[in-house]
């Protein structure tokens, strides 16, 4: 059976006139038809498939006069023109098979159609969608109870088979690329990678950790604040051997905060800068810092309070925001010696050495801040006072030595009267070679450091609260306590010599900070 298309037949088709401008042929420029198929077009397609077989649907228009695209010809043959195609409704066996296949495969209609000869994927899809709506309206389950369990088991097995197939393909790819596919991390210990509850990187107040802290180079070292993502590795590098012990001793941050510093120092084998007996300032013999300035001074000036968190570095300052001088005037008793305690260590320390030992002192105070300037001025003043004392000692008459005893007696009486007004600060024990015998026996009284530039502002509370600053021997006794008993006696001898009329020891030659009134 052959069919020859004529121009009259093509022109008589209304679909060709309407859709001719939308779809063009790729090789002869003729318009392709769209829409429903006619019986004549079905005969042309059947004759072509019988002669050439199925496949290469784009060649149908080339070998015949059928103006249809290849996709349209394929769908027309598969869904309507095949000789083994079944028409009509699905049988009960086919419906049962469709439910089982859908429970295993899902919406893979083409694969399901391969198991149903004579049925198309479109028919199976239409049947399933109709069945879903019908069972939903009736309130019935989509799958039978015994088939639903099988579907779940099959879906798990199918998912495993897919994963195994993908792994096999990846393994083949790795083997083609000369790579090792089987890589196991058996020796990797993930417990070491988990950060503990107690991190040494947070302890910024604990400096001079370990044995290396005794070196002068590391005396002013402070641990910086490190992000949590980097603390694990860097903390082990800074403090090896402490992480494992701390993780065993402390299970929570609350337990660490409630634990005394002595226990922590025994655990990690490093010195703790805080003492339980001095909660405000800490231990004054430990590596500490200036209050409110956070400047390390290697044990000379203590902390204002123990710190456990991050510390913001600031420049040193003697401006105390919490306590003002006006509040000192209003108080009935002298203020606590909190502001003066940091400078008691200067008084308790022996006179600064001269000569070659000054370089060691400068190395300990090598902070480049106000502490360096104060120490340098103090050393220079001591050297000037010693020179003046040598020049004045030779000219003091022997008859005036009795006045020295009188002045010493007045200074001792002033010390006794001062005890009832000033608050005594506890003095920690020191070594015998570092502290004179007299300083170990007598408790230290908080006195003003006249070398500081802001001492004049703080001296106003003595005028109103005590009323004893105007006494003649107050300044001499303060210098005696500040610079040591021996140097204080030197100043008293110099004052006696000046009252005797010695011209070579005039007070105008002294530095402004060391001038004092003459004793009567």
Curated annotation (Swiss-Prot):
Query: Which segments show compositional bias classed as Low complexity?
Result: 331-342
Task: Recite the UniProt keywords alphabetically.
Answer: Activator, Developmental protein, Differentiation, DNA-binding, Flowering, Nucleus, Repeat, Transcription, Transcription regulation
* Gene deletion effect: Hyposensitivity to abscisic acid (ABA). Reduced expression levels of aleurone-related genes (e.g. CP1, CP, GASA1, BXL1 and BXL2) in seeds. The triple mutant myb33 myb65 myb101 has a male sterility and exhibits slower protein storage vacuoles (PSVs) vacuolation rate in aleurone layers upon seed germination. The myb33 myb65 double mutant is defective in anther development, with a tapetum undergoing hypertrophy at the pollen mother cell stage, resulting in premeiotic abortion of pollen development and male sterility.
Write out the annotated subcellular location: Nucleus
Region Disordered, residue ranges: 1-24, 331-359, 426-447
Q: Which InterPro entries match?
A: GAMYB-like, Homeodomain-like_sf, Myb_dom, SANT/Myb
**GO BP term, pick one:** response to cytokinin
Any idea which residues the entry calls the DNA-binding region? 57-81, 109-132
Q: Which Gene3D superfamilies match?
A: Homeodomain-like
Matching SUPFAM superfamilies: Homeodomain-like
Q: Does the keyword Transcription regulation apply?
A: yes
UniProt function note: Transcriptional activator of alpha-amylase expression that binds to 5'-CAACTGTC-3' motif in target gene promoter. Positive regulator of abscisic acid (ABA) responses leading to growth arrest during seed germination. In vegetative tissues, inhibits growth by reducing cell proliferation. Promotes the expression of aleurone-related genes (e.g. CP1, CP, GASA1, BXL1 and BXL2) in seeds. Together with MYB65 and MYB101, promotes the programmed cell death (PCD) the vacuolation of protein storage vacuoles (PSVs) in the aleurone layers during seed germination.
The record's account of tissue expression is:
Mostly expressed in stems, shoot apices, flowers and floral shoot tips, and, to a lower extent, in roots (e.g. root tips), seedlings, leaves and siliques.
Task: Name one molecular function that GO assigns to this entry.
Answer: sequence-specific DNA binding
Is the keyword Transcription in the record?
yes
- Native source species: Arabidopsis thaliana (Mouse-ear cress)
Q: Give a GO cellular-component term.
A: nucleus
**What is the name of the protein in this document?**
Transcription factor MYB33
């Amino acid at each position: 059976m052959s069919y020859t298309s004529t121009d009259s037949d093509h022109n008589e088709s209304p679909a060709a006139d309407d859709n001719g401008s939308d779809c063009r042929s790729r090789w002869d420029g003729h318009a392709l038809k769209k829409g429903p198929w006619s019986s004549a077009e079905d005969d042309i397609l059947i004759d072509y498939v019988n002669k050439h077989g199925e496949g290469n649907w784009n060649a149908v228009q080339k070998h015949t006069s059928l103006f249809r695209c290849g996709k349209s010809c394929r769908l027309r043959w598969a869904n309507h023109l095949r000789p083994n195609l079944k028409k009509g409704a699905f049988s009960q066996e086919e419906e049962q098979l469709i439910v089982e296949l859908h429970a295993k495969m899902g919406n893979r209609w083409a694969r399901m159609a391969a198991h149903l000869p004579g049925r198309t994927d479109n028919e199976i899809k239409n049947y399933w969608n109709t069945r879903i709506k019908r069972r939903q309206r009736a309130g019935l389950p989509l799958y039978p109870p015994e088939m639903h369990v099988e579907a779940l088991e099959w879906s798990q097995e199918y998912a495993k088979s897919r994963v195994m197939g993908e792994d096999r393909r990846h393994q083949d790819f790795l083997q083609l690329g000369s790579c090792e596919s089987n890589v196991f991390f058996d020796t990797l210990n993930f417990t070491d990678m988990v950060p503990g509850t107690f991190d040494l990187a947070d302890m910024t107040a604990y400096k001079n950790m370990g044995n290396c802290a005794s070196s002068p180079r590391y005396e002013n070292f402070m641990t910086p604040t490190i992000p949590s993502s980097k603390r694990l590795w860097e903390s082990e590098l800074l403090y090896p051997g402490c992480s494992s012990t701390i993780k065993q001793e402390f299970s929570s941050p609350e337990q660490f905060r409630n634990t005394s510093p002595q226990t922590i120092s025994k655990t990690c084998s490093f010195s703790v800068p805080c003492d339980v007996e001095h909660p405000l300032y800490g231990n004054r013999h430990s590596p500490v810092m200036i209050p409110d300035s956070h400047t390390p001074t290697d044990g000379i000036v203590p902390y204002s309070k123990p710190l456990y968190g991050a510390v913001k570095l600031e420049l040193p300052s003697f401006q105390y925001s919490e306590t003002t001088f006006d509040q000192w005037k209003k108080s009935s008793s002298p203020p606590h010696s909190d502001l003066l305690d940091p400078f008691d260590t200067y008084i308790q320390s022996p006179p600064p050495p001269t000569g070659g030992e000054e370089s060691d002192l400068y190395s300990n105070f090598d902070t480049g801040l106000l502490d360096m300037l104060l120490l340098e001025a103090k050393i220079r003043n001591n050297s000037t006072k010693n020179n003046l004392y040598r020049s004045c000692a030779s000219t003091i008459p022997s008859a005036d030595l009795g006045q020295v005893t009188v002045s010493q007696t007045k200074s001792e009486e002033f010390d006794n009267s001062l005890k009832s007004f000033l608050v005594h600060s506890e003095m920690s024990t020191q070594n015998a070679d570092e502290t004179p015998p007299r300083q170990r026996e007598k408790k230290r009284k908080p006195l003003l450091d006249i070398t500081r530039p802001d001492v004049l502002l703080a001296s106003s509370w003595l005028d109103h609260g005590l009323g004893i600053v105007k006494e003649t021997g107050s300044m001499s006794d303060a210098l005696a306590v500040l610079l040591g008993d021996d140097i204080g006696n030197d100043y008293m001898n110099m004052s006696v010599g000046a009252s005797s009329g010695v011209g070579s020891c005039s007070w105008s030659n002294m530095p402004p900070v060391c001038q004092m009134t003459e004793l009567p």
